[in-house]
Amino acid sequence: MFGCLVAGRLVQTAAQQVAEDKFVFDLPDYENINHVVVFMLGTIPFPEGMGGSVYFSYPDSNGVPVWQLLGFVTNGKPSAIFKISGLKSGEGSQHPFGAMNIVRTPSVAQIGISVELLDSLAQQTPVGSAAVSSVDSFTQFTQKMLDNFYNFASSFALSQAQMTPNPSEMFIPANVVLKWYENFQRRLAQNPLFWKT
């Protein structure tokens, strides 16, 4: 029903079923994992009105499992990428895996999937740092480049009284640069690939 993928490792499709509605994947050497993808295999959909809460568990310094809610998968959203690298020192949250006897080893974390009502999923709050940024690196680069250019150009701003007339030099009013900057930001927000047209 589910699959789990860590970059550079084989895809896991054989989740350990620990209860009728609970599944876990082991993540050996979890200290070296930054992101994990959880997805539905497409062979068995969730029953109508159901989805799966996705949890990350790692052993604390005493070997006690710390569970943190990452997010969810549903028939309408059959896959999700989660950033887990920053979660390994956080606090746990409420989870449905507490009373289960799940075999653990010290350097193995787990991804847990709990099949629950969609209404219940909508009320849960995942750990904030688990979400992968929806802004791609190109958009981030473009935004940083815009900010850098505007700040650089603005650092040379002079009032007309401060200017020394030089007929061989052109000048661009700062308000024109600001207008371009705001226009570019607006267009980038509407369509990050607008520059390709």
UniProtKB/Swiss-Prot annotation:
The gene is Hikeshi. Keywords: Cytoplasm, Nucleus, Protein transport, Transport. Belongs to the OPI10 family. Expressed in the central white matter of newborn and adult brain, particularly in regions where oligodendrocytes are generated. Residues 18-55 are annotated as: Required for F-X-F-G repeats-nucleoporins recognition and nuclear import. It comes from the Eukaryota. One of its GO terms (molecular function) is Hsp70 protein binding. GO terms for cellular component: cytoplasm; cytosol; nuclear speck; nucleus. Pfam families: Hikeshi-like_C, Hikeshi-like_N. Acts as a specific nuclear import carrier for HSP70 proteins following heat-shock stress: acts by mediating the nucleoporin-dependent translocation of ATP-bound HSP70 proteins into the nucleus. HSP70 proteins import is required to protect cells from heat shock damages. Does not translocate ADP-bound HSP70 proteins into the nucleus. May also be indirectly required for organization and/or function of the secretory apparatus in Club cells in lung. Disruption phenotype: Mice display severe emphysematous enlargement of the distal respiratory sacs at birth. Club cells display enlargement and disorganization of the Golgi complex and formation of aberrant vesicular structures. It comes from Mus musculus (Mouse). InterPro entries: Hikeshi-like_C, Hikeshi-like_N, OPI10. Forms an asymmetric homodimer; required for binding and nuclear import of HSP70 proteins. Interacts with ATP-bound HSP70 proteins. Interacts with NUP62 and NUP153 (via F-X-F-G repeats). Interacts with HSPA8. This is Protein Hikeshi. PANTHER family: HIKESHI FAMILY MEMBER, PROTEIN HIKESHI. It is found in: Cytoplasm; Cytoplasm, Cytosol; Nucleus. One of its GO terms (biological process) is protein transport. Residues 124-134 are annotated as: Flexible linker region involved in nuclear import of HSP70 proteins. The keyword Protein transport applies.
